[in-house]
Structure formats: C-alpha cells, structure tokens
C-alpha cells in the first residue's frame, strides 16, 4: 500500500501488510482503488429515497427528562414523516426527522430552525421534549442524504478477486441507518472474520469462506432491510399520490397489510412480541425468526381478527395528517 501522510506535507511511503481489513465504513474508498487496479468488484446499490434531518437540544434548567413510557411516543411514523428522540448526557438529546425525497415542501420547511421546531411541535409525543418551556436548541438543523443499501461482492464465479483483503461492516454491506443495524452488522461481521482467520492460513480458502459466511449470515439481514426500504418507498408514493384508491385489491395484498398492522399493534401492547422484534433488530437471531414462536403467531392472529382499523389506530402516533402539515408549513414565515 502507498500511504500519504496528510499531516506531514503529503509525504508518501510504501508499506506491506499480511492482511488489509477495510473497516472505514460507508465512505470507504477501497473498492474504488481496487477497481482502478483492475480488480472486478460487483456492487448492488439501491436508493432508499429518503433524507434525514437532525437538530440537537438541551433541556432547560429544572426540566427533568421526560418518561420513556409516556402515552404519546417520542418515536414514530406518521406516514409522510418518521421521527425519533435520542437522549444523551446531561440533558442533551438529538431529534431526528426522516422524510421521503418526494416531500419537497416539508424538506424545504424543515431545513430552517424555525421550520424544524414548528413542524415537530405539531407532534404530541415530542412536546414534552421540545416545547418552548422544555428545551433550547444547541445546533441548527443539518441533513444527511445519499442513503443507499449497498452490497459488494468479492467473488466472481466462486473465485476471489483479491487476496488478503477483507471489507467488514458498512464497507461491505451497508443498510439504511433507520433500522439501527450498522453497529450490530459490523460486530457480527468482525466475529465472522476472526473465525475465518483462525481456521485457515490459506488466502484463497479464507477469501472464499469469508464471502460465503457473509452471504449466509449477513445476507438475510441486508435483504430484510432492503425489503423495508422498498416498502417505505411504495407507501410514500401511495400517500403522496393517493394511489390507495387506485390500487387493485387482492387477498395477498390485504393479508400482507393486515398482518403488518396486527404485528405492529401487538408489539405495542405485548412485551414478548416486542422482545421478539428487538431480537431481530439487534441481530440476536435471523430476521423474522421470532415469528416461529407459536405464542407470538397466535397473538398476531388474534390481533388480525380485531380488524385493521383498530390495529392501525394503535400503531399510528398522534399528529397531523399530511394535508394538514402541508397547510401548517404554509403559515411558517
């Protein structure tokens, strides 16, 4: 490798290593450098079509941190917007808003501090945190885009394209940060690599084994996250274009939506269902494996029998409808 020391007048030096492990994350340049050297690395890249906006706050003196068990949640999905509070130390916290790229009016409004606060204060679950008498902002809103699901393949026809090089975590398989799986995937991937390196000294065997285990153990997590991205894009389009009424009805589509509504409602009210979902989120088991539990399956079925209307009501947090929020932002100076 040729190393450039940016802190020492860009002085260059060449070094050799037994192994190169790329753990540089979503901004990794290694795959580009390898391609420039003629290494064929295939890449799957899917745009989640969303953007995040974050603003940091600090609770005012004398204001206690709100309960995590309040009736109106501090994290939720209104359809046109997802939101969440992430507490820190000493009264500091971050508020993150996730918007579809197509929500141009909302995106424009929320870029300003006034617009960000005004929109968020229409959500009852956020008022205990950012009401005018609760907290003060410590930053302006700032955004992050280019949210892609990325999977890189280092084998071609079953043979490694580069030896003694291993990309781990986001450098190899990147998912939407909305699902909070990045750190868990990175940790799991590091353990996979450790096992591979311990079991063989042969560079070809190592490369093939690492690729196969990555596909076996990380692949299902990546695919589940990608499906959620696609579902989010579809739901956003339906809401924005009012395609719900135009959509052809089918038993399969009805069952899928009814099951999702029932699962979400059951997770809000039944702790053992919630724990099953958390196991999937934290990668303690394969995606959806908790649904093999007969008790959870019976519970979700009982919720389905209650009807979608009641289950949707439990899932959706209080907040303005999309038409109402668009009208609201038109009043912001």
Which residue ranges define each predicted feature?
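FAD/FMN-dependent oxidoreductases across multiple families
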Residues: 103-225
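Predominantly flavin-linked oxidoreductase catalytic cores and closely associated redox partners
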Residues: 1-122
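A structural signal for short secondary-structure junctions
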Residues: 89, 159-160, 255-258
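Short alpha-helix boundary/capping motifs
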Residues: 58-62, 147, 238-239, 291
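Intrinsically disordered, low-complexity coil segments
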Residues: 6-12, 75-76, 157, 239-254
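C-terminal helical "tail/cap" subdomain of flavin- and related membrane-associated enzymes
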Residues: 194-333
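A short, ordered amphipathic alpha-helix with a cationic face
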Residues: 20-21, 184, 249-253
């Amino acid at each position: 490798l040729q190393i450039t020391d940016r802190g020492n007048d860009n002085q260059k030096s060449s070094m050799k290593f037994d192994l190169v492990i790329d753990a540089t994350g979503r901004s990794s340049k290694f795959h580009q450098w390898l391609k420039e050297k003629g290494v064929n690395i295939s890449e799957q890249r899917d745009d989640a079509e969303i953007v995040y906006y974050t603003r940091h706050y600090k609770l005012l003196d004398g204001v206690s941190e709100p309960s995590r068990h309040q009736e109106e949640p501090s994290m939720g999905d209104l359809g046109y917007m997802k939101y969440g509070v992430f507490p820190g130390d000493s009264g500091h916290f971050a508020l993150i808003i996730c918007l579809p790229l197509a929500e141009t009016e909302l995106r424009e409004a929320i870029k300003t501090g006034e617009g960000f606060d005004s929109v968020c204060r229409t959500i009852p679950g956020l008022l205990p945190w950012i009401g005018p008498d609760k907290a003060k902002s410590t930053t302006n809103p700032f955004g992050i885009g280019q949210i892609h699901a990325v999977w890189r393949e280092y084998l071609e026809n079953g043979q490694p394209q580069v030896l003694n090089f291993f990309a781990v975590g986001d450098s190899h398989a990147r998912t939407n940060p909305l699902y909070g799986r990045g750190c868990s995937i990175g940790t799991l991937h590091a353990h996979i690599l450790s096992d591979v390196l311990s079991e063989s000294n042969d560079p070809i065997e190592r490369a093939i084994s690492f690729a196969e285990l990555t596909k076996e153990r990380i692949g299902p997590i990546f695919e589940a996250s990608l499906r959620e991205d696609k579902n989010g894009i579809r739901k956003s389009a339906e809401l924005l274009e009012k395609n719900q009424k135009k959509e052809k009805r089918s038993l399969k589509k009805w069952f899928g939506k009814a099951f999702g509504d029932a699962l979400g409602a059951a997770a809000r009210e039944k702790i053992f269902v919630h724990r099953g979902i958390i196991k999937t989120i934290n990668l303690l088991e394969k995606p959806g494996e908790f649904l093999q539990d007969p008790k959870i399956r019976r519970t979700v079925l009982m919720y389905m029998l209650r009807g979608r209307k009641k289950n949707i009501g439990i899932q959706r947090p209080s907040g303005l409808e999309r038409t109402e929020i668009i009208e609201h932002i038109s009043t912001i100076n």
